[in-house]
């Protein structure tokens, strides 16, 4: 199977978005009409390739659900962005220009991920900043919000699934990591995947859900239990060492997927899953509200262990055997 470039889970978390409960903006800047192939653009480039598990019945060339995350959590704010439509017309409005030019670099990064989440792999948006003249091109990827991507106002379901997608691609380190994304699009069609993908991305990670566009916020829950003391990963938003260490605002840690979510019906899967357990969740309920989530998986190599011989970004020097004090990999501290 050939992994198709699509997304990187390296969106950095925007700590300016800690307070997301704001009133919905009727037609705010998210009134971006995603006119494909035309003219609207967005977020900054991803640091690497992205993939998503979307290949169930198609060839790898048709686009999959494998992605790479690299969106900073600082970039997760959609304040001022309306959901009127991601078409060329929507991107040419004065409102969009005003929103974009408040922070072009961050807006570019966010738009890159929005288009990759909402639009299909054969679609793109181009945008020329009327203030600076800089041109942007944002490529589609997962196709989770087909109506919104073609210029229609986003439905509540599309807002939820794109929010889940943005959260799934965010990490507070801004490091690109290949992830497997499973779930359904806003039209209830499953993202294709193969047995090989599930085998390669064998580590369950998390489920993501919420709504960034109506002030609800976004949430993450672990799908494999918390990391051991000797384990660490840059994907700490979905896979923390404990609830107390899930510092990924504006993403709120909500507990475990098993306790909050309902797995997809086995009959809906494209092939039998060995364990008899569907690999993704269809709904998650939190604070009395039910959301449409996305489920993610990792490759084993992206969960680091103290003692594996490499001092990782997520490990520290010291005289211990845990990630925060890993003598075997990082040595003793010089002071």
Language model regions located:
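Bacterial N-terminal signal peptides
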Residues: 27-37
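Bacterial signal peptide processing site
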Residues: 42-44
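Long, low-hydrophobicity ectodomains and other hydrophilic envelope-associated domains
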Residues: 77, 82-301
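N-terminal secretory signal peptides that target proteins for export/translocation
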Residues: 1-22
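Cysteine-rich modules of extracellular adhesion/ECM and protease-associated proteins
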Residues: 303-335
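Post-signal peptide N-terminal segment of mature Sec-exported envelope proteins
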Residues: 49-70
């Amino acid at each position: 199977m050939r992994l198709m470039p699509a997304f990187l889970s390296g969106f950095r978390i925007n700590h300016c978005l800690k307070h997301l409960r704001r009133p919905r903006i009727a037609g705010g800047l998210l009134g971006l009409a995603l006119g494909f192939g035309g003219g609207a653009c967005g977020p900054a480039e991803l640091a690497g390739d992205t993939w998503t598990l979307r290949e169930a019945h198609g060839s790898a060339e048709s686009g999959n659900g494998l992605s790479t995350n690299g969106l900073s959590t600082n970039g997760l704010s959609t304040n001022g962005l309306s959901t009127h439509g991601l078409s060329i017309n929507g991107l040419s409005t004065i409102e969009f220009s005003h929103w974009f030019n408040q922070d072009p670099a961050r807006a570019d990064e966010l738009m890159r991920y929005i288009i990759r989440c909402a639009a299909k792999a054969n679609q793109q948006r181009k945008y020329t900043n009327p203030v600076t003249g800089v041109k942007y091109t944002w490529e589609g990827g997962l196709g989770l919000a087909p109506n919104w991507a073609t210029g229609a106002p986003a439905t509540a379901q599309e807002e939820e699934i794109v929010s889940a997608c943005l959260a799934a691609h965010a990490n507070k380190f801004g490091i690109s990591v290949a992830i497997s994304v499973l779930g359904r699009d806003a039209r209830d069609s499953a993202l294709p995947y193969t047995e090989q993908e599930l085998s390669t991305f064998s580590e369950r990670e998390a489920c993501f859900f919420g709504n960034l566009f109506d002030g609800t916020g976004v949430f993450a829950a672990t799908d494999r239990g918390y990391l051991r003391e000797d384990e660490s990963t840059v994907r700490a938003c979905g896979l923390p060492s404990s609830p107390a260490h899930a510092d990924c605002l504006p993403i709120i840690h909500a507990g475990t997927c098993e306790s909050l979510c309902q797995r997809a019906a086995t009959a809906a899967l494209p092939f039998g899953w060995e364990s008899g357990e569907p690999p993704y969740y269809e709904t998650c309920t939190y604070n009395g509200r039910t959301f449409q989530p996305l489920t993610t998986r990792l490759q084993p190599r992206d969960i680091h262990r103290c003692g594996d011989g490499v001092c990782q970004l997520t490990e520290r020097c010291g005289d211990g055997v845990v990630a925060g004090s890993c003598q075997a990999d990082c040595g003793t501290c010089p002071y």
